[in-house]
Each structure stands twice: as structure tokens, then as C-alpha cells.
Amino acid sequence: MVMNTHKNKTALVTGASDGIGAEFIKILAGRGYDLILVARSEDKLNDLAEKMSNEFGIRCFVIVADLSSANAAYDLFHAVEEKGLDVNFLINNAGLLRNGFFTELSLADQEQMIAVNVLALTSLTHLYANKMAASGGGHILNVASLAGWMAIPNQNVYAATKAYVLAFTQSLSNEMMAANSGVQITALCPGYTATKMMDNPEQGATLRIPASMMMSAQEVAEMGIKGCLAGKDLIVPGIANKFTASITHFFSKSLLTKLLGSFYRKTMG
């Protein structure tokens, strides 16, 4: 067992039960952070928390929360406060994806996507940015997406939520730096990543993306944490993703949207 060497360091990760979120947990545990694991799946959270506690000698706290519900972010914040925990590292990783034609997807599903991807993330960032600034600093990593760099037909609301996260996070990072707040705000923009989100039937149509085009969740999480701790405001993990992000500046938005629309309609099952 590796003993905790980061006393008084606590990280909160939303969407911690699977995929990139679970990898964030493993990496932070290895760095000696005490952990607050947040997601909807209590069994998965408890299993992961037990493994991390046993392997790394850290404290783990499980909070079951549906971040699409009203006041969920405030309820989560107060639950953490009641435990007397001082969060130094916040990772807003929870996210929902719904694919398909906008008019054919239910409005409720799309509002839920906005609630989690935008409202909950914004609320938690506001609550913890203020608290961290008042207590001497900290780190906030907001998981956006390469989808936020472009308009994507058949995935339009999701892409729009991630565009919000990207713009919001980069501008806030500049604000906090200019104010000498001691709070590092970072946007992580992964591309296609090998997680359950890619083939989750709840998302509607699924994308048939070759494995060769995907990064592992572990790679994405490693780059995100390292970049945030190094003071970067933007992280696009992987050479292929960096190339994709760069070419968005060389095509007109109209042409790029047409190309993406054709690609997504062909690759959606």
C-alpha cells in the first residue's frame, strides 16, 4: 500500500464511476489525493473508492448525485461542506451525450444534457472558484470536447454545450490569472475516446468509429491532470486531435459543417 503523501489535498471528480472519470480517480489516488467520487451509480463508486483506499491509503468519500436535477450542484457543494472537506482540485467531468436529429430527440433529453454539461458545471465552478480563491488557490479542470470546436449536425446540442464549456473555461482562466487568485482553470478537449459513452444506447444513435481513431481514457486523463497542474489553460490531448483542432481554422464554418454532417450521418448506427 502506498501511503498518502499529499496531506490536506482533496480532489472532487464528477462522473467518476466510468471512463475518463474513473481514470482521473486512479491518477489522483496515485498522487496521494483524498477523493470525493460523484456519479449516479452508487455500486460502481463504492467499488472504486474501496480499491483506491486499499491500494493508496487515501480517504475516499462517495456522493451519489444526479447533476441534471434542480439545485444538484448546490446540494453537492453543501454535502461536501458538511463533511468538513476542503477541495483543492475540482474536475467537472460529468457529461451527457445525445445523438440524432434535433427534432426527433426528446426536448427533455436535450434539456437534461444542457443541465449537466452547462448548468451544473458552471455552478460548481462558481462555487469552488470562489472558495479556492479565498483559501489560497486550487485547480479546476473542466472537460469540454473537440466537438466544441465546431458545429456538428446530428450532435448539435452536445457540441454547443461543449463550445460553451470551452469558451467559458478559457475566458474564466484569464480572469482568475489576471486577478492573481491562485486558481488555475483549465479546459480539456478530448476527441474520440474509448469509453462506454461511445456505445451507450441511452445516447440515441451510436457512432461507428474505428478503434484506431480513439485514445484511451487513461491517456486523456493523464494529459488533463498533468496539463492542469502545469498551469495550462487549454489541453487538446493527442497529435490527431491537435491536428483536427488546427484545421478548423482553415475551413469556412459552412463548409466544415457540411463535411461533418455528411460524416456523422454515415457513421451513426
Segments predicted by a language model, with ranges:
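Conserved glycine-rich cofactor-binding loop
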Residues: S17-D18
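Conserved glycine-rich Rossmann-like NAD(P)H-binding loop of the short-chain dehydrogenase/reductase
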Residues: R31-L48
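Conserved NAD(P)H cofactor-binding loop of Rossmann-fold oxidoreductase domains
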Residues: N93-R98
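Substrate-binding pocket helix/loop in short-chain dehydrogenase/reductase
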Residues: F101-F102, D109-I114
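Active-site helix of classical SDR
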Residues: T125, T161
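Residue(s) in the substrate-gating loop at a strand-loop-helix junction
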Residues: S145
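SDR active-site lid
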Residues: E175-A240, F250, S254, K258
